[in-house]
């Protein structure tokens, strides 16, 4: 299948009447930008409609670095019924890579799901079936603004910037949902948690109360809270989830038989519960090795990654790095008098 065939498989344009369209292109490099713009152009009958459909290019993948939504602030000055449509290039690993899990070469050349420009061109040329163009579910500016105003302050001088960041985060949500249909449910991960919390109205009101009670400027408290978020917020990725599963398999093999015995019917029942309700899984363990069993079973059954709470003393070099990128949340053993830590 060549690139032209991929372009014709589906259209990035949403169903609409006379509404304008704003495309958000989630790109990591110039090649992905080229692919997505070519996809848009391929389905533009006259070519003139592109001028009525602004395109904002953002790298939405860096949770820690944040995102520069300045372009989006200006682009959102569009009619309220404008449809915002996010686009992304999804890269599937080779069947060999899926079966083997992360390999040494992946540490050298990077995650096969996130290739650079040169590697991406090579994959498209030699293994085009691994390249997918995906569009997230579109939504109107009006609907997004209504949802934003329910939980965020609109009086703040940074309201427009916060709204643009909110729109970008919603683009991540719908794109991740579309990509999981290709990659698998085990890769459902939270994104931009700290950024969402910092702009949340309820959280800001709680910080305001602490500022009033202690006399500490809010800006200083928010800076302190950002440090707590950096410690606690897990930043999982597809690569490290795969690596953690492989690591668990290796460790469990040191003390147990290769096959893990469990009740498949109970797993399916739990899947339904987790799908329909916020859930907390509690399991016993005699050793730290036992704590690897449940995450491994869930991974093998294509469950969303479970968040695992652990003491901050476990956040040491090596293991802390891995767990932080595989769903681990480290909290202090004692924070009785630290109200800011509690609300964070």
Segments the model singles out, each with a brief description of its role:
Residues 1-344:
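Membrane-interfacial terminal anchoring regions of lipid-handling membrane enzymes
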């Amino acid at each position: 299948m060549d690139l032209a065939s991929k372009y014709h498989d589906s259209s990035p344009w949403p169903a609409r009447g006379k509404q304008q369209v704003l495309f958000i292109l989630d790109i990591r490099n110039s090649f992905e930008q080229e692919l997505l713009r070519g996809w848009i152009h391929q389905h533009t009958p006259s070519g003139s409609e592109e001028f009525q459909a602004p395109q904002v290019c953002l790298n939405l993948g860096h949770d820690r670095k944040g995102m520069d939504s300045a372009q989006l602030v200006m682009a959102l000055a569009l009619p309220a019924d404008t449809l915002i449509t996010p686009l992304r290039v999804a890269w599937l690993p080779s069947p060999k890579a899926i079966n083997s899990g992360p390999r040494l070469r992946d540490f050298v050349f990077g995650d096969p799901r996130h290739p650079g420009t040169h590697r991406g061109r090579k994959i498209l040329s030699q293994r085009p079936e691994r390249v997918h163009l995906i569009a997230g579910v579109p939504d109107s500016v009006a609907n997004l603004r209504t949802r934003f105003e329910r939980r965020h302050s609109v009086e703040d001088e940074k309201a427009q910037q916060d709204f643009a960041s909110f729109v970008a985060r919603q683009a991540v949500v719908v794109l991740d949902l579309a990509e999981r249909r290709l990659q698998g449910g085990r890769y459902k991960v939270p994104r931009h948690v700290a950024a969402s919390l910092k702009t949340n109205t309820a959280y800001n009101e709680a910080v305001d109360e602490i500022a009033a009670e202690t006399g500490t400027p809010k800006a200083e408290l928010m800076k302190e809270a950002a440090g707590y978020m950096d410690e606690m917020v897990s930043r999982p990725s597809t690569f490290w989830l795969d690596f953690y599963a492989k690591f668990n398999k290796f460790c469990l093999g040191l003390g147990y038989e290769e096959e893990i015995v469990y009740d498949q019917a109970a797993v399916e029942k739990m899947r339904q519960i987790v799908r329909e309700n916020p859930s907390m899984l509690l399991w016993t363990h005699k050793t730290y090795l036992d704590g690897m069993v449940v995450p491994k079973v869930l991974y093998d059954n294509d469950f969303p990654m479970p968040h695992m709470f652990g003491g901050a003393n476990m956040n040491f070099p090596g293991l802390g790095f891995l767990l932080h990128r595989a769903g681990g949340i480290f909290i202090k053993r004692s924070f009785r008098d630290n109200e800011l830590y509690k609300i964070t």
